[in-house]
């Protein structure tokens, strides 16, 4: 399929912070020239040099994505190469700054196979369809999500929980490749003209809930007006707040449903039916990082007497 995009709009605001730890690509409120990919990163609050980490990852990943052939499908294997480049850029940045730096990640890209999305942490990715609402919303890699899933706290309690901003997956420099966190990967070919994709840091979602976002983004206003409304509501957030909004102008598909012939392992012809079904895959392959997040959750639960 061929996906044509409208003019993207974005914002990057300080909120009530003194320094800016968010970074976006492209780094413009209205980029005059843009690639078919978009990135938003949030330097982890409280860690040294978060602003360096977010910029290093966004720019390192963007440089690698510029070498991708978007006229074919973009696979998780392709993304691993891009992710490796981002980690390399982060490791290099850490040689001149603090090794304690870290950042969240959100990335979307449009290609022949549809739209691929990857994320780590509590920055989010949304896919909206104006007449249907939210088609996809990423699930935060956070302590509070683990507690909600475990039934320790309710969704309502999570909104004001003191640990709601503790994340358990992020990008941080390391000399050991096996210690690198991996993202959750989501891919869909269910894309129509008028669909809107939205990336943002938690400085936005801390002050605007999903229902309000849906009301604004699925309204009849222009994309620029939608961006302006979200920026206005996020302006006084306690945290840096950054977002990118991009809508689909046109989708030219080959065949939405088609079959292909191939040989199976026994040399027999088999027929596969290909449908535009969204696919979500967790690329976290390092159990030690998952276990460390689990141990952190247990420790905080003990401290808070949950």
Can you name each region flagged by the protein language model?
Residues 1-306:
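PP2C/PPM-type serine/threonine phosphatase catalytic domain
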């Amino acid at each position: 399929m061929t996906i044509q995009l409208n003019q993207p709009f974005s914002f990057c605001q300080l909120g009530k912070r003194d320094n800016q730890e968010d970074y976006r690509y492209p780094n413009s409120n209205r980029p005059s020239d843009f690639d078919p990919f978009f990135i938003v990163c949030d330097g982890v609050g409280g860690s040294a040099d978060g602003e360096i980490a977010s910029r290093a990852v966004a720019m390192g990943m963007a440089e690698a994505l510029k070498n991708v052939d978007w006229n074919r499908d973009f696979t998780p294997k392709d993304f691993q190469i891009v992710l490796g480049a981002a980690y390399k850029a982060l490791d290099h940045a850490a040689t001149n700054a603090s090794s304690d730096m870290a950042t969240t990640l959100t990335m979307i890209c449009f290609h022949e196979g549809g739209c691929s999305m990857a994320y780590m942490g509590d920055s989010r990715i949304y896919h909206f369809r104006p007449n249907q609402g939210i088609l996809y919303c990423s699930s935060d890699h956070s302590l509070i999500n683990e507690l909600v899933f475990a039934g320790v706290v309710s969704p309502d309690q999570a909104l004001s929980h003191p640990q709601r901003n503790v994340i358990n997956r992020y990008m941080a420099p390391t000399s050991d490749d096996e210690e690198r966190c991996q993202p959750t990967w989501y891919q869909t070919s269910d894309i129509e003209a008028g669909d809107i994709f939205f990336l943002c840091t938690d400085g936005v979602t801390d002050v605007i809930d999903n229902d309000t976002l849906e009301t604004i983004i699925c309204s009849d206003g222009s994309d620029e007006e939608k961006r302006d409304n979200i920026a206005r509501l996020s302006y006084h957030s306690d945290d840096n707040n950054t977002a990118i909004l991009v809508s689909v102008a046109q989708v030219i598909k080959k065949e939405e449903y088609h079959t292909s012939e191939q040989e199976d392992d026994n040399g027999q012809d088999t027929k596969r039916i290909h449908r535009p079904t969204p696919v979500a895959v967790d690329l976290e392959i390092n159990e030690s990082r998952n276990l460390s997040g689990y141990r952190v959750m247990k420790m905080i639960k003990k401290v808070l007497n949950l």
